[in-house]
Regions:
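Short acidic/glycine-rich loops and adjacent helix/strand connectors
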Residues: 1-173
Length: 173
């Protein structure tokens, strides 16, 4: 399985080719444009500037990654939420256009799950020791999650939000 991953949730424009075979996740290629210098003079991220810079840079990044490589991927994954609305629209629009042109499924990815499951990159999924606790620190979305096998029988109160995702049970603590 191979995906073109598109991330434009805030002030970095990132595209990657990520593959999985027999539980091994590999980043084949990643290119990114950081907007830090443009935003520093304002003392923080300016949403309108961020989305404009995504629009200006994403096609050049895609071309550097190699348009012909899109034919190799099984699907296109794109960050959906949370994030800056204008920035997210740029990524979703490019993903939708590429999906339509190359006849590839576009898979929305919840931004925070991207952080949580980045632990799988360059590893075999079988090497993960569950249960585990993960701290995410991403802008205003700083949380602690308990990750268990999806089949885990837990005694936890139901007042904690829970999700099942990619074969894992996730509890926000």
């Amino acid at each position: 399985m191979k995906t073109l991953a598109i991330e434009t949730s805030c002030d970095d424009t990132s595209l990657a080719i990520v593959s999985e075979e027999n539980g091994n996740f590999q980043v084949e290629d990643i290119l990114a444009y950081s907007q830090i210098q443009e935003h520093q003079k304002f003392g923080g991220v300016v949403p309108e500037l961020a989305s404009r810079l995504h629009s200006e840079k994403i096609i050049a990044i895609l071309q550097s990654l190699g348009l012909e490589r899109i034919k190799e991927v099984d699907f296109i994954s794109v960050t959906t939420e949370p994030g800056l609305p204008g920035s997210l629209v740029v990524g979703k629009t490019v993903a939708s256009l590429l999906g339509e042109f190359y006849q590839k499924e576009v898979v929305p990815v919840y931004h925070i799950w991207g952080h949580v499951f980045s632990i799988l990159l360059e590893r075999n999924i079988q090497d993960l020791k569950l249960p585990m606790v993960i701290l995410t620190a991403s802008g205003g979305h700083n949380d602690i999650y308990l990750i268990e096998d999806q089949s885990a029988q837990t005694q936890k109160k139901s007042d904690f939000p829970q999700w099942e995702y990619a074969g894992f049970k996730i509890t926000k603590l």
